[in-house]
From Swiss-Prot:
Keywords: PQQ biosynthesis. The gene is pqqA. There is a cross-link at E16-Y20 (Pyrroloquinoline quinone (Glu-Tyr)). It comes from Pseudomonas syringae pv. tomato (strain ATCC BAA-871 / DC3000). One of its GO terms (biological process) is pyrroloquinoline quinone biosynthetic process. Belongs to the PqqA family. Pfam families: PqqA. This is Coenzyme PQQ synthesis protein A. Required for coenzyme pyrroloquinoline quinone (PQQ) biosynthesis. PQQ is probably formed by cross-linking a specific glutamate to a specific tyrosine residue and excising these residues from the peptide. Pathway: Cofactor biosynthesis; pyrroloquinoline quinone biosynthesis.
Length: 24
């Protein structure tokens, strides 16, 4: 993904946090 957007960054961070908690 080369396009950068604040909303996309928030979504990506939230997704990574969700995956982090889901893999625990």
């Amino acid at each position: 993904m080369s396009w950068t957007k604040p909303a996309y960054t928030d979504l990506r961070i939230g997704f990574e946090v969700t995956m982090y908690f889901a893999s625990r």
